[in-house]
Design a protein with these regions (language model features):
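Glycine-rich, proline-tolerant flexible connector loops at the mouths of alpha/beta enzymes
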Residues: 95-96, 122-138, 167-170, 200-218, ...
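Active-site capping/gating regions of soluble enzymes
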Residues: 1-46, 59-75, 183-184, 191, ...
Length: 347
């Protein structure tokens, strides 16, 4: 039976049949079946619901250490994206799941389903805005996902992502450096929590009133490059955190090839000036007709989406020609099931 521990000592006692902490500070799994059945939930629920900070910290540490003992790694998806960019894979699409509640249960179910269909390329992500209203810091979210992986009996990489680390345009207009500092802090917290994938969204800063596409995308590219350069300083030695950018604010007009090319050109210049030789982006999110949450209708339904797969295909090909894995379709959660097969078709 899963329980919420009231202290680190009680947590160790509740888990004593499932695992032990060795004198060297690692975790040894004693009963894998019991760990999956109840131990992982005890760690997850204690981390989420305990009111004692030391107990929460102990549960978060146990989640990371137990995951390692179980053969689970919070991993960067950059190697897979690099292989896609090099043409090693076709017909590949990577769904990203924004789990806002019941994260332990939902990540477990998602990974059990993936294992049953011999799948592994899926991302668990949470946006900065979602962190706020769901009261989940990166460390909280990573703990729940890793515990879900343990409960699922998963082995191998788990991709956890900071989604939409977004520059809020209204705040940026009056305090640009303050907003940039917020994004930098978010990146630091994500890396510290074990996130190995982060998406920066400065597309809100695009100014379509400027005369050229390069000028329109410049602030977007520069602020994204600043964040990428910071993450390159923070990432562990020998590991590349997968970084994403964005050119089309979701829910607004469709992106174009000219915009993507201008953004990547401006980004490359900005990154080189801050961190010469640093690895840049692995993907770029674009807008092709969706909006987050869909467009609600008066009767309670959701309007059909006029999704432009031609645009997605064109931008994906351009992105791969520039060494990226492709283009990312945001706001797909409300799309009808009969459209999802199109994503690997168009790349």
């Amino acid at each position: 039976m899963s329980r919420i521990a009231t202290s680190p000592a009680v947590l160790r006692q509740l888990l004593s049949a499932s695992l032990r902490v060795t004198p060297a500070g690692s975790v040894e799994i004693l009963d894998a079946a019991q760990l999956r059945q109840s131990g992982a939930a005890t760690i997850a629920w204690t981390a989420a619901f305990s009111t004692d900070e030391a107990t929460v910290a102990a549960a978060q540490w146990l989640a990371r250490a137990t995951a390692v003992a179980a053969g689970i790694q919070s991993a960067s998806i950059a190697p897979l994206y690099a292989a896609r960019a090099n043409g090693a894979y076709e017909w590949l699409t990577v769904p990203a799941l924004n789990l806002r509640s019941q994260v332990f249960e939902m990540s477990r179910t998602a990974l059990e389903t993936a294992a049953a269909m011999d799948g592994a390329a899926l991302i668990f992500e949470l946006a900065r805005s979602e962190q706020t209203y769901t009261f989940q810091r990166p460390a909280d979210y990573a703990t729940s996902v890793l515990c879900g992986a343990i409960a699922a009996g998963w082995r191998g990489p788990v991709f956890i992502q900071g989604d939409h680390y977004q520059f809020v345009a209204k705040k940026y207009a009056t305090d640009p450096e303050g907003v940039a500092a917020e994004i930098a802090r978010a990146c630091r917290l994500a890396v510290d929590a074990g996130y190995r994938n982060i998406d920066i969204d400065a597309s809100t800063l695009v100014d379509l009133a400027l005369p050229t596409v390069q000028e329109q995308q410049r602030v977007n590219a520069v602020r994204t490059a600043e964040a990428v350069a910071l993450v390159r300083e923070l990432e562990p030695a020998g590991l590349e955190i997968s970084m994403g950018g964005e050119i089309g604010e979701v829910g607004h007009q469709n992106s174009t090839a000219e915009e993507l090319a201008a953004y990547l050109d401006e980004f490359d210049v900005a990154l080189a000036s801050r961190s010469a030789g640093a690895r840049g982006l692995r993907k770029v999110s674009v807008q092709t007709g969706t909006s987050h949450g869909g467009v609600p209708l008066p009767g309670g339904g959701v309007a059909e989406v006029a999704l432009d797969f031609t645009v997605l295909k064109e931008l994906g090909e351009l992105a791969r020609a520039r060494g990226l894995a492709g283009a990312v379709q945001h706001g797909a959660s409300t799309l009808p099931e009969d459209l999802f097969h199109r994503f690997p078709e168009v790349g």
